[in-house]
From Swiss-Prot:
The RCK N-terminal domain binds NAD and possibly other effectors. This is expected to cause a conformation change that regulates potassium transport. Part of a potassium transport system. This is Trk system potassium uptake protein TrkA. Keywords: Ion transport, NAD, Potassium, Potassium transport, Transport. The lineage of its organism: Bacteria, Bacillati, Actinomycetota, Actinomycetes, Mycobacteriales. It comes from Mycobacterium tuberculosis (strain ATCC 25618 / H37Rv). InterPro entries: K_uptake_TrkA, NAD(P)-bd_dom_sf, RCK_C, RCK_C_sf, RCK_N, Trk_Ktr_HKT_K-transport.
Length: 220
């Protein structure tokens, strides 16, 4: 997967490092020469320049990228880059970092943002989710204990379509906490039917993740 990351600060580098380790092709854009350190992540393609300048985005052929990540420390830059990526280059997935919660209302599809997040680990997970429908994605590791917040997006042709939540025989130490369906946030009652495209959020121990995948994604 080709990913362009804007911002080589702590967040941008953290995201880039994690995605590189997972085998993705990353271009890291930074406008401050003092932050440009190709030796820090030699596997990434480093570019010096302003991510809000069309000429720079054209020079890296942004239209060929699968995902753009606006990870700078400036919300204005992140919003402008998101809009350019979506409207000028038709990038399929745009993920943006929100620095100031008061600006969160700006980070929506009207400004080209598909997903707005605020923590590096969740940022990296949601970037990868762009091409991992039908995979288990670990969104967050809790500080205490061994539990994680994990997400599974059911494929459109899921065999679980139309079946109620109570039919799920979940592994021990795994709990379904939320179903995201379009704009809705659904509390998973026993009789709630599942649908293709549902995003299921679980709290589960690491050992239960593989069993969850086998249960919900048997053909994957």
């Amino acid at each position: 997967m080709k990913v362009a990351v804007a911002g080589a600060g702590a967040v941008g580098r953290s995201v880039t490092r994690e995605l590189v380790e997972n085998g993705h092709d990353i271009t890291l854009i930074e406008r401050n020469p003092d932050h440009l350190d190709a030796a820090a992540i030699p596997e990434a393609h480093w570019r010096l320049g302003d991510a809000c300048e069309l000429s720079l985005l054209e020079s890296i052929h942004l239209e060929e990228f699968d995902v753009v990540v606006a990870a700078t420390g400036d919300d204005k830059v992140n919003v402008v880059l998101s809009l350019l990526a979506k409207t000028e280059f038709a990038v399929p997935r745009v993920v943006a970092r929100v620095n100031d919660p008061r600006n969160e209302w700006l980070f929506n599809d009207a400004w080209g943002v598909d997903v707005a997040v605020s923590t590096p680990r969740m940022l990296a997970s949601l970037i990868e989710e762009a091409v991992t429908i039908g995979d288990l994605v670990r969104l967050m590791e809790f500080r205490t204990g061994q539990a994680n917040l994990v997400e599974i997006t059911l494929p459109d042709n899921t065999p679980w379509g139309g079946k109620p939540v109570r039919k799920l025989q979940l592994p021990r130490d795994a709990a379904l906490v939320t179903i995201l369906r379009g704009p809705r946030v659904i509390v998973p009652e026993a009789d709630e039917p599942l649908e293709g495209g549902d995003e299921l959020l679980f709290v589960a121990v690491t050992e239960a993740e593989e069993e969850l995948s086998r249960l919900l994604l048997p053909s994957m």
